[in-house]
Amino acid sequence: LGDVYKRQVAEYCEKWLLMQSAKVSSGTLRGYTQTMNNYIVKPLGDMYLEDVTADDIRLAMIPLASKSAGLYSKVNMLLKCVFYSAERSQLLEYNPCEGLSAKGGKPGKKINALTDEQVKLLLDTVRGLPPYTFIMIALYSGLRREEILGLQWDCVFLDVPTPYISVRRAWRSENNRPVISTTLKTKAARRDIPIPKCLTDCLREVKEKTESEYVVADRNGNPLSSSQFQRVWKYVTVRSTKPHNYYKYVNGQCVKCTVTPTPGSHQKNNPKLVYAIDFDVTPHQLRHTYITNLLYA
C-alpha cells in the first residue's frame, strides 16, 4: 500500500462514525462515539490502520475483560465494523480483527422476576403515587421504559372487545429533554399488546382525570424528562427497607448518617411514608416479570 492510504485509526474511526450518522439515531451515535473514543481510539488511535496487528487488537481488549459482557461485545462489534469497512475500501491488505472472539467480559447480573407477593406489595405501596401508572403498564403489558414514556392515548384502545395497547412511538432523552419518535428499537417492537382487565380499569381511570395526550405525563401534560422520571422512580426507592444514607450538620460539619429501616416503619419527618419494599426492583425488572409470567401462563 502506498503513502496515499496512510490513515490513522482515530481518523478512520471519525469517518466511520460520520458514515453511520445517516443510519442510526443521535442517541445511538453518541453511544458509539463515547465507546469508540474510550476503548478504541485511546489505545489504537495514533497507529496507522495497516500497522495494526491482531496482537494490538487483543491487547486493546484486555481492559474490557473486567467490564460487562455487554460492553465487551459492543467494543468487539465496533472494532470489526471499523476494520471490515477499511478492508472493503481497500485501505487494508490484512484485517487484524479476523478470528477475534466475541466472547468476553463479566456476565451480567441475573434479573429475577418479581413474585406475585412482591407485585402485590409493590402496587399496594405506590398506589395513588406518581409511579403507579407506569408500574401497572410495565407489569401488565411488558412495555419498555421508552415505550411507556412515549405512549399516547391514541394508541390505547379500551372500548373494544379485547382492549390493547399499540406500540408506535418511543421516548428518548436529549440534553434532559424528552424526544418522542416513531423510530422504534427494532421492527418487532412495533406491535399490539392485549391488556388484562386490571390494567384496562387503571388506564380508564387515568384517562378520565387527564387532559394530556400522554399516558404518563408531568403536571403540565408533557412527556417526562429523564430527571423527572428519576424523581418519579424515587417514590419507589425511598420506600425500600435497604439502608438509606442522609446528611446532617453536627457542630457545623456535614456528617453522613445511615439508617436501616424495619419493614412497616414510618419515616420520622413524613409519617405517611412507609418502608415496605424489602426487595430490589427496577423498571426493566417489571418488563422481565411480565415476560416470565407469559412463559409460565
Regions found by a protein language model. Give the residues of each.
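Short, small-residue-biased leader/transition segments that mark boundaries at the very start
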Residues: L1-Y5
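Charged catalytic carboxylate motif
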Residues: Q8, Y12, T35, D56, ...
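N-terminal core-binding DNA-recognition domain of tyrosine site-specific recombinases/integrases
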Residues: L17-L91, P96, G108-K110, N222-Q228, ...
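Conserved hydrophobic/aromatic pocket- or pore-lining residues that grip, position, or stack substrates
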Residues: I40, I57, L79-V82, Q90, ...
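Short, basic (Lys/Arg/His-rich) helix/loop patches that form interaction surfaces
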Residues: A69, K120, D124-L129, S141, ...
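Basic, Lys/Arg- and aromatic-enriched nucleic-acid-binding interface segment
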Residues: A69-M77, R88-W153, D159-T162, A188-A189, ...
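Basic, Lys/Arg-rich DNA-contacting stretches centered on the C-terminal catalytic core
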Residues: G104-K106, K110, T125-V126, E146, ...
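Short, polar N-cap/turn motifs at the start of nucleic acid-interacting alpha helices
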Residues: C155-Y164, D280, A297
